[in-house]
Amino acid sequence: MDQNNSLPPYAQGLASPQGAMTPGIPIFSPMMPYGTGLTPQPIQNTNSLSILEEQQRQQQQQQQQQQQQQQQQQQQQQQQQQAVAAAAVQQSTSQQTTQGTSGQAPQLFHSQTLTTAPLPGTTPLYPSPVTPMTPITPATPASESSGIVPQLQNIVSTVNLGCKLDLKTIALRARNAEYNPKRFAAVIMRIREPRTTALIFSSGKMVCTGAKSEEQSRLAARKYARVVQKLGFPAKFLDFKIQNMVGSCDVKFPIRLEGLVLTHQQFSSYEPELFPGLIYRMIKPRIVLLIFVSGKVVLTGAKVRAEIYEAFENIYPILKGFRKTT
């Protein structure tokens, strides 16, 4: 006979193993204070809940790590594909040539099929093949050359004097020299012939600017070195090198800069609110051109004179195609 069935109804809940959880049956204990609620509350297993929360937290962390790894892989793939595309574009622009025909405007665009195979284990950034628009710099025949020779306006050169220098002594004893260490950590010295300016640093390095030719720049640098020698320093003349050449010219006609920047977006930028000239970055030779609507052109970034001449002969037919006809 079942023990629970022999007990009164009000005591069956107490005798059952789940008596503490049986609703409707009040529980009384002499140890309970007077007025304590008699309705039992279910006992929660906090250990199982904490384990579930920890598992969910670990899963979320793993998902975040996987997402970060995927983003890093995508960024690396994009960088690799951009590098491959840039190298291919540079190679194609260096190999392009045009055949000029009389009575026709120079060709300004060239559509070339570019196939970029994805690297092993990567996904292609764009479908292959693609047909990017790359500007052409048409070669002008000798009979149709521009006839304009850019004039050199400034040459920047550097030289190493091979010894440490006391700039205060140089500024006090040399003529046409100024030194303000709070403003600039070099002595600024000037001479009249050739009219140039030198920046002399305490390490012995010197920068010479303002010369109009390579010979003038070398001559001016030697004169500055001689001045330092006369002040008692064991100065030498080492590692003379031309760092930058700036030239300018005028094509004698106005230019539509808006059309030029739309045609050559890869190589040019034009923000008239910030700077009135169009900035054109030529790849070969590596020259930066400042083109103004009036027809004035400034070329900078050359190491030798021939690079300035070559860059202008490349850009002249393009400027001719964007000549204003009003």
UniProtKB/Swiss-Prot annotation:
Q: Which UniProt keywords apply?
A: DNA-binding, Nucleus, Repeat, Transcription
Region: Disordered; residue ranges are 1-21, 114-146
Quote a single Gene Ontology cellular component term: euchromatin
Tell me where on the tree of life, at the top rank, the source sits. Answer: Eukaryota
Cross-referenced InterPro entries: TBP, TBP_CS, TBP_dom_sf, TBP_eukaryotic
Say which family it is in: Belongs to the TBP family.
Q: What does it do?
A: General transcription factor that functions at the core of the DNA-binding multiprotein factor TFIID. Binding of TFIID to the TATA box is the initial transcriptional step of the pre-initiation complex (PIC), playing a role in the activation of eukaryotic genes transcribed by RNA polymerase II. Component of a BRF2-containing transcription factor complex that regulates transcription mediated by RNA polymerase III. Component of the transcription factor SL1/TIF-IB complex, which is involved in the assembly of the PIC (pre-initiation complex) during RNA polymerase I-dependent transcription.
Q: What is this protein called?
A: TATA-box-binding protein
Q: Which organism is it from?
A: Macaca fascicularis
Gene symbol here is: TBP
